Amino acid sequence: MTSSPVSRVVYNGKRPASNTRSPSSNEIFTPAHEENVRFIYEAWQCVERDLRNQVSGMDRGVVEEYVEKNPSNSLKSFKPIDLNDLKRRTVQDPKKS
């Protein structure tokens, strides 16, 4: 069985030339979808800029970690997962889905 490489999301606002799609693509993005993607991209760029400035000593206290003061009892057993790993396992073994 040949496994194809896992695709990665690129947030630089540009698509690689090898990833261009033909006009007959079934995927249609609405203006609202494109606006949401643009908003998330721009917001993330601001976070990354603030984090870089904070690390380099230019700004202090701009980016901070949110910690719940009163954690929910239902989340005590929550264990974070690596979504890339989950996708990789799903792609490698499609019979289990």
Swiss-Prot record:
Residues 1-29, 72-97 are annotated as: Disordered. Residues 17-28 have a biased composition (Polar residues). GO terms for cellular component: cytoplasm; cytoplasmic stress granule; nucleus. It is found in: Nucleus; Cytoplasm, Stress granule. One of its GO terms (biological process) is regulation of epithelial to mesenchymal transition. It comes from the Eukaryota. Residues 82-97 have a biased composition (Basic and acidic residues). Keywords: Cytoplasm, Nucleus. Coiled coil: none annotated. Signal peptide: none annotated. May play a role in the regulation of the epithelial-mesenchymal transition. Belongs to the MCRIP family. This is Mapk-regulated corepressor-interacting protein 1.
